[in-house]
Curated annotation (Swiss-Prot):
Organism: Mus musculus (Mouse)
Domain of life: Eukaryota
Residues modified by glycosylation: N63, N79, N92, N113, N117, N215, N227, N357, N374, N457
BP GO annotations: innate immune response
GO cellular component, one term: extracellular space
Record key words, sorted: Disulfide bond, Glycoprotein, Immunity, Innate immunity, Secreted, Signal
Gene3D superfamilies: Bactericidal permeability-increasing protein, domain 1, Bactericidal permeability-increasing protein, domain 2
Protein name (record): BPI fold-containing family C protein
Gene expressing this chain: Bpifc
């Protein structure tokens, strides 16, 4: 009887494990989507970059020996040196998504014009000169597969790579060029054979893919945002690839700088719309902003202490006519005694993303204190308040521009405190400080903008931001600066302030 129960127990355990695993699904904080339009533009730019690189490629000498039976010569040693690609064309080239795998590159009917120096040596003669080699019917295919490694980095692998040159035509130049050109056609077959054996495009491509993996792994997935927080942008799953797009699902979570502990909430699922009008779509979930709010709160970043002089001097320099109002605050409360204003968050700012509405609600406490003649600090009044603001967003050039507007301001006294005339006046003054002082100054700072990253000199153009239910949607086209020299590494990310520390395993929820 006990033996029969064992399979049943194992089955129950398996079902329970599957249930637990399904309930721990991790959703992204950020999803970046690349569309077919981006591939088409990337192909267009890539061909221009290849034209620049082709002129700098060092091609090894091509040499060998062949028997020329039509001339009754047993063997001729030949050497082609100083080989340079002058021009090439790949009119039938395409990039397409391969669902569940990656991106396929396909090119056929390509041509290339190559100049070279040549020399031949036979038992009865030797000669040298210049020549042009025209290649046609160039065929290339390969798939770049996208995966994710154990540390949250994207990883690439080149699969099914094949290169074939179908035709080669040689034109010789020199004193005996007419003679050589008369029997160039029989020489083209062995040249084509050796050329196909020596074409190293696939190994070169594999080497570049491997170098990309090395470079991307050298970057830290944690980026230091400020003195309080870091941002984790590691991949949480392999890239998702359909016939129409490629999605990168990123962690998109903020952490306190000194403690990589997940916040006490998890991201909710969201889905990007099936639109193909832009090259790039980025979905930034509510979780991204909530984790930023939580990380700054637990790091102690959301608090400040200001003296009468600091407040008056600061606002008199930045807000016309406002400093004179603040200079009278001491008279209102404590006559000629200076005061100290302490403001601190009592919880993480609450983030709410609804369609066409991005709002932040700041719960905080404000304490006004005065310093007596004997240096004793005496509290005047203590209040809790909640300020609700709306957030406006726009992308201008290469910067993300933000602005805040105050929706409502609510003060509340502790239950055992009395609400007298001084408190009412303090409410009015504090509300005025927020309306006419804090928010305008914050907006002045915010409107300087946050620079958007442009790796490999890729910029955002025709950008738009839309607030949807539970996430922000950024749509943009891309532009590549073709005037800059292509870089073989990721130096364009070098200005990011990266945290150099070992990465931990992906958290589970």
């Amino acid at each position: 009887m006990r033996t029969k129960q064992v399979p049943v127990l194992w089955a129950c355990f398996l079902l329970w494990s599957l249930y637990i695993a399904s309930s721990q699904t991790v959703y992204p904080g950020i999803t970046a989507r690349i569309t077919q339009r981006a591939l088409d533009y990337g192909l267009q730019v890539g061909m221009k970059v290849l034209e620049q690189l082709a002129k700098e490629i060092v091609i090894p000498d091509l040499n060998g020996s062949e028997s020329l039976k039509f001339l009754k010569i047993d063997y001729v040693k030949y050497n082609f040196s100083n080989i340079k690609i002058n021009a090439f064309s790949f009119p039938n080239t395409s990039l397409a998504f391969v669902p569940g795998v990656g991106i396929r590159a396909l090119s056929n009917h390509g041509t290339a014009n190559i100049s070279t120096n040549w020399s031949v040596k036979a038992p009865l003669f030797r000669d040298s000169g210049a020549a042009n080699l025209f290649l046609s019917g160039i065929y290339f295919t390969g798939i770049v597969a996208f995966t994710r490694n154990d540390f949250g980095y994207p990883a690439l692998e080149l699969q099914d790579c094949h290169v074939q040159v179908s035709h080669a035509r040689v034109s010789f130049f020199g004193s005996l060029s007419a003679l050589y050109n008369s029997f160039a056609e029989p020489m083209e077959k062995p040249i084509l054979k050796n050329l196909n054996e020596m074409v190293q495009l696939c190994p070169i491509a594999i080497s570049q893919v491997e170098q990309f993996n090395v470079n991307i792994s050298a970057l830290e997935v944690l980026t230091k945002i400020d003195n309080y927080t870091v941002l984790d942008c590691s991949l949480i799953s392999p890239p998702e690839i359909t016939e129409n797009h490629l999605d990168f699902n990123l962690k998109g979570a903020f952490y306190p700088l000194e403690s990589l502990v997940d916040p006490p909430f998890t991201p909710a699922p969201f889905h990007l719309p099936e639109s193909r009008d832009s090259m790039l779509y980025i979905g930034i979930s509510e979780y991204f902003f909530k984790s930023a709010s939580f990380a700054h709160y637990v790091s102690g970043a959301l608090g400040t202490t200001l003296s009468t002089r600091e407040i008056s001097n600061y606002f008199s320099q930045n807000v016309q006519g406002f400093g004179s109002v603040l200079s009278k605050i001491a008279e209102i409360y404590v006559l000629s005694q200076p005061f100290i204003l302490q403001m601190m968050a009592t919880g993480p700012p609450m983030v709410n993303l609804q369609r066409n509405n991005f709002s932040l609600e700041f719960p905080a406490a404000v304490i006004m204190l005065t310093q007596l003649d004997n240096s004793t600090i005496q509290p005047i009044v203590s209040m809790d308040f909640v300020a609700s603001t709306s957030v406006g967003l726009a992308i201008l050039g290469q910067k993300l521009i933000c602005s805040l507007s105050l929706n409502r301001f609510r003060l509340s006294l502790p239950e055992n405190s009395q609400r007298d005339a001084k408190v009412v006046r303090f409410e009015n003054i504090l509300s005025s400080i927020l309306h006419f002082g804090v928010l305008p100054l914050a907006n002045t700072k915010l409107q300087q903008g946050f620079p958007l990253p442009n790796p490999y000199n890729i910029s955002f153009i025709n950008s738009d931001i839309e607030v949807l239910e539970g996430y922000l949607l950024v749509s943009s086209d891309l532009a590549y600066d073709t005037s800059s020299k292509p870089q073989p590494n990721l130096n364009s990310w070098g200005d990011l302030n990266l945290v150099h520390r070992p990465w931990r395993e992906q958290p589970t929820h």
